[in-house]
Amino acid sequence: MTDKRDLLILGGGLVGMTLALAAAKKGLSSHLVDRADPASLTADGFDGRASAISTASWRLFRHVGLEETLEPHGCDIAAIAVLDQMKRGRLDFRPEPHEGTLGRMFANRQLRLALHEAAAKEPLISWHAPVEVMSRDRSEFGVSATLGD
């Protein structure tokens, strides 16, 4: 395939997909390549972890159109306490009443589902997965990758 796009993004995880969506909002096309199978990454029970999404990252998710899909699945971070193992003392972070929250918590699976759904609907994103990158080349004129499919 010799389809030219504005961006080549190697890695379609939370960051890569968010980058592709943000770029698409600005009119940039991308090839988004990942070796993992999207079906397994979004399967029930694959990843029980959750991520703390900062206020700035939440604004980015809202900007790329994920708010409506994600909002019912998250919860506000009202305060953060930082402890250093068994040492005495701790740091407490609490926003002022006019500042809102410190961010939101989401299950990683929910983040992936929302990102995959949004990327699938975006014509400026060409999604390639699961596929291995066999080689890549960077030059003063651009970048290219040879995929294993």
Residue map of PLM features:
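Long, low-complexity, intrinsically disordered polar/charged segments
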Residues: 1-9, 32-34, 40, 141-142
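N-terminal Rossmann-like FAD-binding beta1-loop-alpha1 element of flavoenzymes
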Residues: 5-32
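Glycine-rich FAD pyrophosphate-binding loop
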Residues: 24-49
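Short glycine-rich hinge loops at helix-strand junctions in the catalytic core
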Residues: 27, 65, 124
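N-terminal FAD cofactor-binding segment of flavoenzymes
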Residues: 45-84
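Conserved N-terminal helical subregion
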Residues: 73-149
